[in-house]
Curated annotation (Swiss-Prot):
Belongs to the adenoviridae hexon-linking protein IIIa family. Cleaved near the C-terminus by the viral protease during virion maturation to form the mature protein. Disulfide bonds: none annotated. GO terms for cellular component: host cell nucleus; viral capsid, decoration. The keyword Phosphoprotein applies. This is Pre-hexon-linking protein IIIa. Induction: Expressed in the late phase of the viral replicative cycle. Residues 449-472, 522-543 are annotated as: Disordered. Keywords: Capsid decoration protein, Capsid protein, Host nucleus, Late protein, Phosphoprotein, Viral genome packaging, Viral release from host cell, Virion. All late proteins expressed from the major late promoter are produced by alternative splicing and alternative polyadenylation of the same gene giving rise to non-overlapping ORFs. A leader sequence is present in the N-terminus of all these mRNAs and is recognized by the viral shutoff protein to provide expression although conventional translation via ribosome scanning from the cap has been shut off in the host cell. The keyword Phosphoprotein applies.
Length: 563
């Protein structure tokens, strides 16, 4: 009895101590994870078939294999859940949580530990980092063909100056676009041959550019801003090699890195828009060429007559009537008002005002009308760079509507014209006086001018005629208040015009009034003398001065010309 008492007392004592100690309670709750001795491990392994061998052997092989592996090599001991269980037991003993809430707290603590401080998380991160390194290495191996090109390009760029005199932004933006071209396009290579570097592209046929000569040609053109009329003279400075480089790099540029106000930015934008148009209507030329080749004519020069006939007799299409929707017109008025206020109140340049207006737009408003706003802002940017006066008039005019070129993409901005009324000293009165003076001088010849200077102020037919012309002109220029008087003045002017005689008629009447003079014929002697050996002794059939009247009468001005 004593022995039994001694056996039961410790067990009761141990259970009481475990209930008071959370760590012992957690150890008892997680008993399968404690360390086993070698004898316990052997007995556990052999106990798989101790009961009934046929029962164990009849199980699937996968289940038997898992049981054997687990019995021989148990899973790694992880005390995390034991520690969490200890914490939960301590919270229950202290009254922080109820006993029925322990399972939820235990699950939440395990989930948080596995999320933020778990070996599995670290291993997953290591696997993810390994996958990333493998993907990067694979990408580098795929692009191994461009590594040599990038190395050659970097060595070429190392020889270029870091800064230029002007246009530093355009210079760095163009270099970035060139790097993007070499790294992204698979059929593009850069190599060195002697002191020169070459760029070779095989996208649409093999095209080779001498980078050294191209950058030497572009050296004085970085940041050059050329107006519309001076672009032709600057265009002559670019070589075909440089133009090809600009054409290849243009798809990788934008108006942010390279300013569109500069000449190179204008060319790159032009090339980029030209390459962006995929639809080219060349069916007529292809059909005519195919028919000609089928007929045995390989020379395309013989097709000029056919092509000229097709171009001459093509049907003309009625121009489309472009107009804005009410919503688009409201957008135009909003942008006009915003840009004009920025320019007048904040004293910003046109380009800065457009940029600030675009930056302050509401995102939802811009997202709903993105295409039209981009098109309108691009049109205003072009107008501000090419025709500032036209841009100012378009922004300040509350009734302005975009022209046809805005819809078709053919931008043709009008140039400034110097009108007569632009001068500060000109007026309509001065213009009228100049016209009257010119009208009087038109009907006066040189003889009448000299006579008018020498003779006193006696009225002459010419002066009376001038006065009549002036009166008639004044009557026409003055505003006509009475219709009857205007008709009478027109009749008087017509009667005077009918009585006027032309210079030809006056010369004919004067010639008819003169008596006819018969001049004796001149006889030339057969014997030539030295005194008369001047080349004019014989009549010349090419120099005939016979006849009466003034031989230069046909050079005098005619008075019969109309106003």
């Amino acid at each position: 009895m004593r022995k039994r008492r001694t056996l039961t007392a410790p067990s009761h004592f141990n259970s009481m101590s475990a209930a008071l100690n959370p760590m012992k309670m957690a150890a008892m709750q997680s008993q399968p994870t404690v360390d086993d001795s070698w004898a316990a491990s052997i007995s556990r392994i052999m106990s798989l078939t101790a009961g009934d061998r046929h029962k164990f052997s009849s199980q699937p092989f996968a289940n038997r294999l898992d049981a054997i592996l687990e019995a021989v090599v148990p899973s790694r001991k992880d005390p995390t859940h034991e520690k969490v269980l200890t914490i939960v037991n301590a919270l229950i003993e202290n009254g922080a949580i109820r006993r029925d809430e322990g399972a939820g707290v235990y699950d939440a603590l395990l989930h948080r530990v596995s999320k933020y401080n778990s070996i599995n998380t670290q291993s997953n991160l290591e696997r993810l980092a390994g996958d990333v390194r493998e993907a990067v290495a694979q990408q580098v191996r795929i692009a191994a063909g461009n590594l040599g090109s990038l190395t050659a390009l970097n060595s070429f760029l190392a020889r270029l100056p870091a800064n230029v005199e002007r246009g530093q932004d355009n210079y760095t933006g163009f270099l970035s676009a060139l790097k993007l071209l070499v790294s992204e396009v698979p059929n593009t290579e850069v190599y060195q041959s002697g002191p020169h570097y070459f760029l070779q592209s095989s996208r649409n046929g093999t095209q080779t550019v001498n980078l050294t000569n191209a950058f030497e040609n572009l050296k004085p053109l970085w940041g050059v801003k050329a107006p519309t009329m001076e672009r032709l003279s600057i265009s002559a400075l670019l070589t075909p090699n440089t133009r090809l480089l600009l054409l290849l790099v243009s798809p990788f540029t934008d108006s942010v890195s390279i300013s569109r106000d500069s000449y190179l930015g204008y060319l790159l934008t032009l090339y980029r828009e030209a390459l962006g148009r995929n639809h080219l209507d060349e069916r007529t030329l292809e059909e005519v060429t195919e028919v000609s080749k089928a007929m045995g004519n390989e020379n395309i020069n013989n097709l000029q007559a056919t092509l000229n006939f097709l171009l001459t007799n093509r049907q003309k299409k009625i121009p489309k009537d472009y107009s804005l929707t009410p919503e688009e017109e409201r957008i135009v008025r909003f942008i006009q008002q915003a840009v004009s206020l920025r320019m007048m109140q904040e004293n910003l340049s046109p380009t800065e005002a457009l940029d600030v207006t675009a930056a302050n737009m509401e995102p939802s408003f811009y997202a709903n009308n993105r295409d039209f706003i981009n098109k309108l802002m691009d049109y205003f940017h072009r107008a501000a760079a090419i025709a500032p006066d036209y841009f100012l008039g378009a922004v300040m005019n509350p009734r302005w509507l975009p022209p046809e070129g805005f819809f078709t993409g053919v931008f043709d901005f009008p140039e400034r014209d110097n009108y007569i009324w632009d001068g500060p000293d000109s007026s309509l009165d001065l213009t009228r006086q100049d016209a009257m003076r010119f009208l009087e001088e038109k009907f006066i010849d040189d003889d009448q001018r000299t006579e008018s200077r020498s003779v006193s102020r006696v009225p002459t037919p010419a002066s009376s005629r001038r006065s009549s012309v002036a009166m008639a002109s004044d009557s026409l220029i003055r505003p006509m208040n009475n219709d009857k008087n205007s008709l009478r003045e027109i009749e008087v002017l017509a009667d005077k015009l009918a009585r006027w005689k032309t210079y030809k008629r006056e010369s004919e009447e004067a010639r008819e009034s003169l008596p006819v003079v018969v001049r004796p014929k001149k006889y030339s002697s057969a014997i030539s003398s030295d005194e008369s050996d001047d080349g004019m002794s014989k009549p010349d059939k090419f120099l005939k001065f016979e006849g009466s009247g003034n031989p230069f009468a046909h050079l005098r001005p005619k008075l019969g010309r109309c106003l």
